[in-house]
Amino acid sequence: MAALARIGGRHLKSVCLINSSASCFFTQRRGVASKLFIGGLSFCTTEQGLSEAFSKCGQVVEAQIVMDRVSDRSKGFGFVTFASADEAQKALMEFNGQQLNGRTIFVDYAKAKQSLGGGGGYPIARGPPDPAVIAATRTTETSKSD
């Protein structure tokens, strides 16, 4: 039997079993349990430096700093993925609010990526309508008013 698949208006990626622990639900609601969001990074922090700093808490699978596409400069945040959820939790407890490269960093569990839904709700521009379609529409509107 499955537990609630939709809570608070948000769909969960997978569903916990009823007899499983509550941490299963919260892990899935947050996103990936072994991936951490790191905010407040210095612009001089590198992916290698981030990986080395967080490797004190466990095996770092990936360290990523998000870059601006235009300027190719750090946006000041990134992600660190650990081999296990326990290592990620240890890093969260140890690094949140601490200094790294002269800046206070903020650590939290990464959230699942949200779908943008095809351009934010704006229609796709397809050019002017075909004249035949306009004529057919006018003919239909005229016949309805008769």
Curated annotation (Swiss-Prot):
Distribution of this protein across tissues and organs: Expressed in rosette leaves, cauline leaves, stems and flowers.
Localization, UniProt: Plastid, Chloroplast
Modified residues (Phosphoserine): 42
Up-regulation conditions: Induced by methyl viologen.
Organism field: Arabidopsis thaliana
Alphabetically ordered keywords of this record: Chloroplast, Phosphoprotein, Plastid, RNA-binding, Stress response, Transit peptide
Pfam families in alphabetical order: RRM_1
Effect of disrupting the coding gene: No visible phenotype under normal growth conditions, but mutant plants exhibit increased sensitivity to salt stress.
A single GO BP: positive regulation of response to salt stress
GO cellular component, one term: chloroplast
Major site of localization recorded for this protein: plastid
Role of this protein: Probable RNA-binding protein that may be involved in salt and oxidative stress tolerance.
Keyword RNA-binding: yes
Superkingdom classification of source: Eukaryota
GO molecular function: RNA binding
Descriptive protein name: Small RNA-binding protein 11, chloroplastic
RRM domain mapped to chain residues: 34-112
Transit peptide: first to last position: 1-31
